[in-house]
Amino acid sequence: MKHQFSALEARVIGCMLEKQVTTPEQYPLSVNGVVTACNQKTNREPVMNLSEAQVQETLDQLVKRHYLRTVSGFGNRVTKYEQRFCNSEFGDLKFSPAEVALVTTLLLRGAQTPGELRSRAARMHEFSDTAALESALETLATREDGPFVTRLPREPGKRESRYMHLFCGEPDTATLAASNETAGVDTDALTARVEALELEVAELRERLESLLGHLGE
């Protein structure tokens, strides 16, 4: 596939696509806007902490490669950027709204199951059911000008296979599996911590009620 990006380029493109749909009133984006979008703590995997210089360098590279263009003119005191990656007037890459939502979510969060994709892509496109989403994934995986996504081998103990975009090359399945396993462990630890805190709060509430009861006697 001719459309290949570095990890930072993929993050910037994903942010551009996301903001174009979800916050059109703030689009095109300034450099600061792109930095903020790239470093979001939510809906990003991995969470990044990019500097303005890193983002500016990435923007410049994408402009040179004709995946972005600068927007400046009357009323614009700062340079802003908009994507030419897909569905642009002069570009040859065309995606449906469903495909844009899936590609964007994969660019921003990496490998995911159909269930995860349906939930996380809902702000950009509402899929009627999982079958409709899987149909769109299959189209992305088999298009003549692609493939753009691939289905990863199902991991032991998992019910669903995950899908990954191919805009950064063939995925390293071993690394992705290890990352997913670590994420699962982190989630389990967080759940246990929350349950422990809830129990502690309940005990403190009982003590407080008992103390108030004694004071009222």
Swiss-Prot record:
Membrane-spanning segments: none
Lineage: superkingdom: Bacteria
The protein's name: UPF0502 protein ESA_02280
Cited NCBIfam families: PRK11239.1 (NF008413)
InterPro entries listed in its UniProt record: DUF480, WH-like_DNA-bd_sf, WH_DNA-bd_sf
Similarity remark: Belongs to the UPF0502 family.
Entries under PANTHER family matching the protein: UPF0502 PROTEIN YCEH
